[in-house]
Regions:
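C-terminal accessory/tail domains of diverse enzymes
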Residues: 12-188
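Active-site histidine-anchored catalytic micro-motif
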Residues: 1, 7
Length: 188
């Protein structure tokens, strides 16, 4: 079974925004994996952000794309120019950014024919990209998620998926989460 990979133009990204993107994905890994129903057997092709990579990125605070690229490929013995490089098999793939088409790839989406779900995937990818580009800094710290549905809904609102225009996106992205979308501490 193939999956949906969304490629976003990386031309406007800076070292700061790439680090933001890494931290955003790292902090929301668990929530995204549950919301998007990423199956355990797909994990080898769609790994969560590597904690060691995130830690190195935040400790070193690279100021150039070359420095970010070096950190991204650290620990891999194969050539960086290898098309099917092992670094690419993560929810957030920067291999396509550094080698080839200059795009940032998000790989966490199931094969789907439902137009509303596909739209939700694309809107989420674009909103994540926008957050990475515009936010001054992003933390890799995982948020408290005692109520997954509330956490996802408030996060989606925070990144701009507000109003009737994004109602279906919010519904699709919160559908498989537990809890109550309206109340943080009230049972569903």
């Amino acid at each position: 079974m193939h999956n949906i990979h969304i490629h976003i133009d990386g031309a406007d990204h800076t070292p700061r925004s790439i680090r933001n993107f890494i931290n955003i994905i790292a902090s929301k890994n668990d929530l995204f994996y549950k919301a998007l129903q990423i199956e355990p057997d797909r994990m080898r092709f769609c790994k969560k952000m590597d904690a060691a990579l995130v830690e190195k990125m935040n400790r070193r605070r690279p100021k150039t794309m070359a420095a970010i690229e070096n950190i991204w490929y650290e620990g891999y013995s194969e050539s960086r120019s290898t098309h099917y490089h092992n670094s690419r098999y993560h929810f957030l793939n920067l291999h396509s950014f550094f080698n080839g088409n200059g795009t940032i790839e998000l790989r966490g989406f199931n094969s789907e024919l439902h137009a509303g779900k596909i739209r939700s995937y694309i809107v989420l990818a674009l909103a994540l990209n926008h957050q990475a580009l515009t936010q001054k800094c992003a933390s890799s710290k995982k948020p408290q998620v005692e109520n997954e549905k509330f956490a996802m809904r408030t996060y989606l609102n925070r990144i701009g998926l507000i109003g009737d225009e994004f109602k279906n996106c919010r519904e699709h992205l919160c559908r498989h989460l537990s809890g109550n979308a309206a109340w943080r501490f009230r049972a569903a």
